[in-house]
Amino acid sequence: MSIREEAENERQKLKNMSWKDRAWYVWEYYKFHLLAVILVIGVLSTIGTMIYRQTFTTRLSVAIINDRSAGASSSALLESELREYMGCGKKDLIEINEGLMVDFNEESTSQYGYATLAKISALVASKSLDVVIGDQSAIDHYETVSAYQNLEELLPPELYERVKDHIYRAKDGEGNLMPVALSLEDTALGEKTGIIMDPPYLAIIQGSPHKEAALQMIEYLFP
C-alpha cells in the first residue's frame, strides 16, 4: 500500500468514527508521534529562549534578605528609577531577588531558610550578585567570611564624604571591624519599596562583576 493509499485509508476510518472515538484512536495510535512533536517544540522553545536571553545584558543584580513586609513590598519603582538613573536600554536588566528569608541561627533555620542560603551561595559562586540589601544579621553573617567590599577603599572620595556617617562596621573572620555596609534608614528606600527592616543595610559583594553599577545605586540612594 502506497503512502497516499494509507493516508486515504486512515481518513476513511476517522470519517466513520464519532468525535470521542476519533480522539481515542488518534491518541492510541499516534501518541508517541504527538509526544515526540511536543518534545521537539519544547526543546526548540528552550533553545530559542536561551538564545534570546543572551541578547540581554545584566547591569546590576541585587538580593534583598529578610524583608519583614510579608510580601507587601514591591521593588518595581526602585527598579524603574534605577534603570532611568543608570541610563539602561531596553535590553539591559536590573535583577532584584526578593523573598529571601533566613534565620542565621542554625538551630532554628527552616527549610526555606536553607533554600535561601543555597540561592545566595549559588549567586555569589557564579558571580551573579552585586549588592545585598539586608538586615544586620545578614550583613554580620556574611562578613564572617569576608563577603563584602571595604567601602573605605572602594568608594570614590566625593561619594565617601556623602555617606560616611551611614557606614556600618561588621566583624570579619578574624574579628576585625570592617566598613562594609551603609545604613539605608535615612534614605527613601522604605518609602519607594515598602521594605520593612530595622534598619536595612546595603553592602557590595567582593566578587561583584558590576561594581560601577553598584556605586551608581549608592549615588541614587544618597542624592
Segments and roles (model prediction):
Residues 209-220:
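Short amphipathic alpha-helical coupling segments at ligand-binding clamshell hinges
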Residues 8-21:
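Short, membrane-interfacial amphipathic segments enriched in basic
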Residues 58-68, 94-97:
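Short, well-ordered beta-strand elements
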Residues 109, 115-173:
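Extracytoplasmic "Venus flytrap"/periplasmic binding protein-like
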Residues 196-209:
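A bilobed periplasmic-binding-protein/Venus flytrap-type ligand-binding module shared by bacterial periplasmic
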Residues 77-131:
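Extracytoplasmic/periplasmic/luminal assembly and interaction segments
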Residues 31-51:
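Hydrophobic membrane-insertion alpha-helices, especially the h-region
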Residues 67-71, 137-141, 208-209:
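Solvent-exposed loop/turn segments at secondary-structure junctions
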